[in-house]
């Protein structure tokens, strides 16, 4: 009988899946733990819930004790990290210690490592490399096509299974796809999957959205969950069903209700970004885009060019950070800058009009502001940003934003970029009607 890992019970004696990330560099925050996030999403796609994630440093005794604890409360443990040849790679040894078993050399694995590394005879007896070849006698090996550290699938006791993977994301992912998915589906899945569809919002906060969809947030299947990010909001709709089509049918009416309520604010779904949506719309209209940036210092350009295909619409950007460059590159008179100030609606508008002309683009966006932490005044505090958008038929849109002084410099820059892209998106949307 397969263990049921698909329930949502919160009872303390309820068993399930756990993820254990091993490595002092993760514990100290020197490296971001992307593996756990990725595995969590994979488990959801397989229809499994996991109830706990743990991170532990490179200490054999602590790892061993924690694995003993996990074996008492979970059916399946997935570990990442600690499988390499260095002294602080302790995972396999610690697991063996947890269950008081002996590790045995797999000679075929050593042959694989020698072949991969083309080892000279003087290095072939290197014990640190060879430690990667030792496993419990009855463990199933998960081969590593991209590295030297194999993982394993092992059942140390009835009702408990361990899957181990190296910490290198590219190695872990290919091993997972080639071995783990099939094993988990055969041994732990009850035929249900979780399928999610995410709606991406801009220009509206989480609290305002939540107020209007209180009834949807209480749904059990599908569930609706908000995830706020800097300047954006995601609503993830997740259904549990026997197949993807059934899940999509459960999600469909909820998605339609949300789109009806928030049509102006929803810019895309799933992995779509403001940049990708904007580029798609400009391509459809056969129109081009250029920027004149001051306080964002090129971040707006960097954001748009991260999207494949941006070269078909994006002409370029004039980074006029100093007043001198505003004069020489954008032809803004010195006396005009002195009169209104470099951070002003008037200068932002001059920047966008002149950038559009110089870059020969259909649309242009200019931005000038005070990102802080210094440089603000009572009249123009830190966080003030002026955005101006110019387009065909003498179109001009001017926007003034004052972001909270509690925001740091990078946050103000990122929020400013978000407003720029979303504002042009809304302008194009209004012209499409």
Curated annotation (Swiss-Prot):
Pfam families, per database record: CinA, CinA_KH, MoCF_biosynth
Protein origin, superkingdom: Bacteria
HAMAP family hit by this protein: CinA_B
InterPro entries: CinA (IPR050101), CinA-like_C (IPR036653), CinA_C (IPR008136), CinA_KH (IPR041424), Competence-induced_CinA (IPR008135), MoaB/Mog-like_dom_sf (IPR036425), MoaB/Mog_dom (IPR001453)
Annotated protein name in UniProt: CinA-like protein
Family per similarity comment: Belongs to the CinA family.
CDD domains on file: cinA
């Amino acid at each position: 009988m397969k263990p049921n890992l698909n329930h949502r019970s919160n009872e303390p004696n309820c068993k399930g899946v756990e993820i254990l990330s091993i490595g002092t560099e993760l514990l100290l925050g020197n490296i971001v733990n992307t593996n756990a996030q990725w595995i969590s999403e994979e488990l959801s796609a397989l229809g499994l819930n996991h109830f706990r994630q743990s991170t532990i440093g490179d200490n054999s005794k602590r790892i061993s004790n924690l694995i003993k604890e996990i074996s008492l409360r979970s059916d399946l443990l997935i570990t990442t990290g600690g499988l390499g040849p260095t002294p602080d790679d302790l995972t396999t040894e610690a697991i063996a210690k947890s269950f008081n078993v002996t590790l045995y050399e797999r000679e075929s694995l050593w042959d694989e490592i020698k072949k991969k590394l083309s080892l000279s005879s003087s290095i072939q007896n290197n014990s640190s490399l060879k430690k990667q070849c030792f496993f419990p006698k009855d463990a199933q090996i998960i081969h590593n096509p991209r590295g030297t550290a194999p993982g394993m699938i092992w059942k140390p006791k009835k009702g408990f299974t361990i899957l181990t993977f190296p910490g290198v994301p590219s190695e872990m992912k290919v091993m997972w796809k080639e071995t783990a998915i099939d094993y988990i589906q055969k041994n732990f899945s009850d035929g249900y999957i979780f399928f999610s569809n995410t709606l991406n919002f801009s220009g509206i906060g989480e609290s305002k959205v939540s107020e209007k969809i209180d009834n949807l947030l209480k749904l059990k299947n599908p569930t609706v969950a908000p995830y706020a990010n800097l300047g954006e909001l995601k609503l993830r709709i997740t259904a549990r069903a026997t197949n993807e089509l059934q899940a999509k049918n459960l999600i469909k009416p909820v998605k339609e209700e949300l789109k009806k309520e928030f049509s102006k604010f929803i810019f895309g779904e799933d992995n779509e970004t403001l940049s990708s949506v904007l580029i798609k719309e400009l391509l459809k209209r056969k129109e081009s885009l250029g920027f004149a940036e001051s306080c964002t210092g090129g971040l707006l350009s960097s954001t748009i060019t991260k999207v494949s295909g941006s070269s078909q619409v994006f002409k370029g950007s004039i980074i006029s950070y100093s007043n001198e460059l505003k004069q020489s590159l954008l032809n803004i008179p010195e006396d005009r800058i002195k009169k209104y100030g470099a951070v002003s609606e008037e200068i932002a508008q001059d920047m966008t009009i002149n950038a559009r002309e110089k870059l020969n683009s259909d649309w242009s966006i200019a931005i000038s502001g005070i990102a802080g932490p210094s440089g603000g005044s009572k009249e123009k505090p830190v966080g003030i940003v002026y955005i101006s958008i110019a387009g065909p038929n003498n179109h001009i849109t001017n926007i003034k934003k004052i972001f909270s002084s509690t925001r740091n410099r990078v946050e103000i820059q990122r929020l400013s970029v978000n407003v720029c892209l979303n504002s042009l998106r809304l302008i194009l949307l209004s012209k499409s009607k």
